[in-house]
Regions:
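PRPP-associated nucleotide enzymes
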Residues: 2-110
Length: 110
């Protein structure tokens, strides 16, 4: 959910690598990285982590965004859905429910 120093993420990566994991990716909502970028650089260079995915829901430092192992996930579209749902007093589940979209796409190709 939140990566601050990243110690727990790196602990998982090291443990899984010992169990012969080929690749390790981490995902977090808030990539704060208050410290610890160098530890992630080293883990990436040594093959312990393949990448980290973090959303654009909080500030990401230019130093973090330059890292080859960090991948930003743009969730602004979903924030717009949340705001629209609140403003129209509807459940977000009806907005994000993919079933109707899938049915519509399938009907176009039958």
């Amino acid at each position: 959910d939140i990566i601050s120093s990243g110690e727990s993420v790196l602990d998982m990566a090291y443990a899984l690598k010992k169990k012969n994991a080929r690749r390790f990716f981490a995902y977090c909502t808030y990539a704060l990285y208050t410290n610890g970028l160098e530890k992630f650089d080293k883990a990436y260079e040594e093959g312990y982590i393949s990448g980290v995915f973090g959303t654009n829901l909080t500030y990401r430092s230019p130093e973090l965004l330059e890292r080859p192992w960090f991948h930003e996930v743009d969730v602004s579209k979903y924030i717009a859905y949340f705001i629209a749902s609140i403003n129209h007093d509807v459940s977000i589940s009806t907005v994000l429910d993919p079933h109707e979209k899938i049915k519509t796409l399938l009907s176009k190709h039958q």
